[in-house]
């Protein structure tokens, strides 16, 4: 195996080659759902998109199951690229704010607990997971379709 040192932040030739291979082989890996009454595929239109996975789409595993990439397409971005109009952007923005505030509070709490115990905050925080925040946001977007991810 040849290892190379990348000193240029630009897209490398091997990355372009790999992206091409993924685009070529991805259709062979698609999962098709049971189709009844011509319900799938859904025609592009207005969609109310909700859920943490809409913008924070999970693209792989964790640890060795994760893949470092420059960019990956989120559910929101993919639906927009397919011609859908996302009508719930205000909800997603509000949800992002709720999560950001919850994360800030979580980090402050972990740092405080570590200080009280006399433990390094980084070490104390390892393995701790922020719980999903509780929130009440109106589900008031309109559309031809609603999707929760």
Task: Tell me what each language-model feature is.
Residues 1-149:
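C-terminal non-catalytic regions of proteins with extracellular/luminal or membrane-system context
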């Amino acid at each position: 195996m040849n290892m190379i040192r990348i000193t240029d932040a630009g897209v490398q030739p091997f990355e372009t080659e790999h992206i091409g291979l993924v685009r070529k082989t991805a259709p062979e890996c698609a999962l098709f759902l049971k189709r009844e009454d011509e319900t799938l595929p859904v025609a592009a239109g207005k969609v109310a998109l909700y859920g943490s996975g809409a913008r924070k789409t999970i693209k792989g595993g964790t640890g060795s199951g994760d893949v470092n990439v420059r960019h990956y397409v989120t559910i929101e971005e993919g639906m927009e690229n397919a011609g859908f109009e996302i009508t719930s952007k205000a909800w997603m923005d509000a949800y992002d704010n709720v999560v950001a505030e919850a994360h800030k509070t979580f980090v402050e709490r972990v740092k405080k607990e570590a200080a009280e115990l006399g433990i390094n905050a980084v070490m104390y925080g390892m393995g701790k997971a922020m719980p999903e925040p509780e929130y009440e946001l109106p589900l008031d977007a309109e559309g031809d379709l609603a999707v929760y991810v």
